[in-house]
């Protein structure tokens, strides 16, 4: 990564009211982005958002900045991140902008850009936008100012797109599904997609009020979904996150099915159908069980850095079509250009229906290794914990003990001041102790 001032691994993100998520900054960001994007000739930008209360304020600021640079904005209203990527492609817009902090609490928000082809903006374009941010805002001539409009039935367009990724010859008739929309951007989309494909749907997390997004619901907290699946005696549960780019599932017994297992099911089904091209891409956090299960099927596996943009880069580098993070970002390049929770969930449902198998049974070919993750908050500017000699020594000792039957990974979060300590191995008690031992060393820095 280059030394960029504002853009992180997933756009610009922070606490609302604190720099950079302030009205004046976002107005200037809209202007700077408009100046850079206008060089490519198009004058149209798609703007979508999740259900955070701050989205109203930030979309107004963005639109004002874009208009000053001479670009027009088309609003989608609350819409999943992958829907904005899709609409950007279908409208041939110069870019799409999503106002969301994904799985974070309501008091955070962020700005993320898509290019004309529905993929994340290249680094050099983000750098050009940052360079424009250092200049004084100017305004185009009045006759050249941008306009604002709303996209008619944006939700309906995306619902039809999602349904189109599900095989025409299959139906969800007879399946009882609980879907948890995290009080986020999929609340008016996912239940309708599933119902229209024939499922009996129980929807939770579908009452957004601006401040309850991701609050004890959604892909980052599946406890409510697990409980509801058991109470309803449902066939499965589907949990999406606040902006709909992640999916975590729950089987009929209430067991959590994460992004690694979801990718395993989709990759294996692709192999069975003769549609798998190449291998599958995971990340440094992907479970060793996934790697071993894919190897047994003869499916090549590669690891990318953590972050869906790096999974996508690795897919493009290898010419493969399927990648995922264990957090639930699943990228299926034969269907879409970015992580799409609804579309990924539909492919798992298709495998269930086609094979007459439960979600639990579809997961049975993959044995998950115990993987313990401990997050340690650190103070920026107090030295790099990853370069500390004591931390390095403890880590090396743990790695030597695990040998080739486990892994240790220490990395910084791309969005928060956290060190993520991950230890993986065959014995859960052992890896838990090792993870906390390393975490204690990090805390002592």
UniProtKB/Swiss-Prot annotation:
UniProt: Mg(2+) binding residues: 102, 241, 243, 245
Pfam families in the record: PGM_PMM_I (PF02878), PGM_PMM_II (PF02879), PGM_PMM_III (PF02880), PGM_PMM_IV (PF00408)
Protein function: Catalyzes the conversion of glucosamine-6-phosphate to glucosamine-1-phosphate.
Protein name: Phosphoglucosamine mutase
A GO term for molecular function: phosphomannomutase activity
Active site: 102 (phosphoserine intermediate)
Gene Ontology process terms (BP): carbohydrate metabolic process; peptidoglycan biosynthetic process; UDP-N-acetylglucosamine biosynthetic process
Species the sequence originates in: Salmonella paratyphi A (strain AKU_12601)
Family indicated by similarity: Belongs to the phosphohexose mutase family.
Enzyme class: isomerase
Modified residues (Phosphoserine): 102
């Amino acid at each position: 990564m280059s030394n960029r001032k504002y853009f992180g691994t997933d756009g610009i993100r922070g606490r609302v009211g604190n720099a950079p998520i302030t009205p004046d900054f976002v107005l200037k960001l809209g202007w700077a982005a408009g100046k850079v994007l206008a060089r490519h000739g198009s004058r149209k930008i798609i703007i979508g958002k999740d259900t955070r209360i701050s989205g109203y304020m930030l979309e107004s600021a963005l639109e004002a900045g874009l208009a000053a640079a001479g670009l027009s904005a088309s609003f989608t209203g609350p819409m999943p991140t992958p829907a904005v990527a899709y609409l950007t492609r279908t409208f041939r817009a110069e870019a799409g902008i999503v106002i969301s902090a994904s799985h974070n609490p309501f008091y955070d928000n962020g700005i993320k850009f898509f290019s004309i082809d529905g993929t994340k903006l290249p680094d050099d374009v983000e750098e050009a936008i940052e360079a424009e941010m250092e200049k004084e805002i100017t305004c185009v001539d009045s006759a050249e100012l941008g306009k604002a409009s709303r996209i008619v039935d944006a939700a309906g367009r995306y619902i039809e797109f999602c349904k189109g990724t599900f095989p025409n010859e299959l139906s969800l008739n007879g399946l009882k599904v609980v879907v948890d929309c995290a009080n986020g951007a999929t609340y008016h989309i996912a239940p309708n997609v599933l119902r229209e494909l024939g499922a009996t749907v129980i929807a939770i997390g579908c009452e957004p009020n601006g401040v309850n997004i991701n609050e004890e619901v959604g892909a980052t907290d599946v406890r409510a979904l697990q409980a509801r699946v058991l109470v309803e005696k449902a066939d499965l549960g589907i949990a999406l996150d606040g902006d709909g780019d992640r999916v975590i599932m729950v089987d009929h017994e209430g067991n959590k099915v994460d992004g690694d297992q979801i990718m395993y099911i989709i990759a294996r089904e692709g192999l069975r159908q003769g549609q798998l091209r190449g291998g599958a891409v995971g990340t440094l956090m992907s479970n060793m069980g996934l790697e071993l299960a894919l190897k047994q099927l003869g499916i090549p596996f590669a690891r990318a850095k953590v972050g869906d943009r790096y999974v996508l880069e690795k897919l493009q580098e290898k010419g493969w079509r399927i990648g995922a993070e264990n957090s639930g970002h699943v990228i299926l390049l034969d269907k879409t250009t970015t992580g799409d929770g609804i579309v990924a969930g539909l492919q798992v449902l298709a495998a269930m229906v086609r094979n007459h198998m439960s979600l639990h049974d579809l997961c049975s070919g993959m044995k998950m290794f115990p993987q313990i993750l401990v997050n340690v908050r650190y103070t920026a500017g107090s030295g790099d914990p990853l370069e500390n000699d004591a931390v390095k020594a403890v880590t090396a000792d743990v790695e030597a003990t695990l040998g080739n039957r486990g892994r240790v990974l220490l990395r910084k979060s791309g969005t928060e001041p956290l060190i993520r300590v991950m230890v993986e191995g065959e014995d859960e008690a052992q890896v838990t102790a090792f993870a906390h031992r390393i975490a204690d060393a990090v805390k002592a820095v």
